Amino acid sequence: MKRILLSLFAIASVAFAKAQTATPTTVIKTVIPFEQTDETPWITRYQKDITYYQKENKRLKDLSCDALFLGSSSINLWDTIYEDFAPLKLIRRSYGGATLRDMIYNYNTIAQGYKPKSIVLYVENDLGSHKEGVNAVKCFDLFRIFIAKLKKDYPTTPLFVVSLKPSQHKADQLKDQLLVNALLEENATAQGYTYIDITKVMYDEAGNLRTDIFKEDNLHMNGEGYKLWTAIIKPYLTAVKK
């Protein structure tokens, strides 16, 4: 028995020695530099809006509503939104320039703890060639993350995701917008939401983007434009209330 143990020890010693002198199969020839950046100033750039909503939520106390509207300036600058959707009771938690990234960061304030019968989501600012812009696939991934959070908190509440709108101001993003819209429409059943296409009413019979439905900045909708949006979105919300 002692001889067997000595033999096993000898074999193990040889194997260990070979392992110590063996040539590694993977060799790292270069060091990849890692630069850590602090995105806090960017992600919290609209803290004034968030602080306002935090105070508003405490003031309201009753956070029940027929529809919770979430999103960026196209929702925030909708001056007639409460009149347009009357008699539905709305709560709006939007701010100009919002992206899905800071909406995820501010989720607890703008989206959690409410009692909506339905939710409407519109946000378009993640795309772009600017410093903080992302491509269409990344934008869609951010949508999926935000939608997943909503579905976790409101599993039985109808969620309506509105398509990204075309505009002359963001004409360079049109291809990416179309791709994101196609992915959102295709993903609707899998994630359990309803996709609402508002782009179809924004073109004339010749297929040209209408200019009479935008403000002078050629980016945001004017009153006529919001009438078109209301005509498409409101029936969905009215049907939920029934």
How should each PLM-predicted stretch be described?
Residues M1-A67, E83, K241-K242:
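N-terminal secretory targeting modules
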Residues K55-D66, I104-G113, K149-K151:
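Short amphipathic alpha-helices and their capping/turn segments at secondary-structure boundaries
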Residues L68-L70, I91:
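Conserved beta-strand elements of the Class I
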Residues L70-G71, V162:
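Short hydrophobic segments within beta-strands
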Residues I75-I91, D102-F140, L164-Q168:
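Oxyanion-hole/transition-state-stabilizing segment in secreted/luminal serine hydrolases
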Residues K89-I91, P158, G192-T194:
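Conserved beta-strand segments of alpha/beta enzyme cores
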Residues Y107, F143-A148, N181:
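Generic structural signal for well-ordered alpha-helices
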Residues P166-K242:
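Catalytic His-Asp segment of secreted/periplasmic serine-dependent ester chemistry enzymes
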